[in-house]
Amino acid sequence: KLFGFYLIADYSFFLMLSFAVLLGAESIVDLLIYSALHELGHLSMLLICGGRPDSLRLSYYGLALKYSTQLSKIKECFVLLAGPLVNLVLYLLFKNEMNLLLFVLNMLPVYPIDFGRVISLFSYRLSKVLGCITLVLLIALAVYMLIVYKSFSLIFIVCYLIIYSFNY
């Protein structure tokens, strides 16, 4: 327990971090730092809204804050949007494209992404419809990027979103 909540580190987190360091992939280390700042935004707003964190999990896909505190829908929105807001502010201050990408990704209307969770607070059905439309568009974009740029990055993100959005 750290600061009153559990810090859980999956082995996959250390494996990915080790590969990043070995391969000199500073961008992965940067991504983890920006993801940590993103989660710190959620955590800060959770504390401001009177909530208490249960755990922070580190894994191959980044960091995830878990909490069981019951908040009003408005406070929950503040908590959910605080993370992307951190990335937007970092982008505006430092013109770092990775923070812009994190902001855009987290503002997609797909559950379990932050903005998808905001929508689901108010309408489960709308959340599912917007999520499906967004996923179809993302699949098309991912295939295009794979064919034209030989880039697999969006494929991985889309697979993650499909797996988690259909389990909700």
Go through the PLM ranges and name each one.
Residues 1-168:
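Hydrophobic transmembrane alpha-helices and their immediate loop junctions
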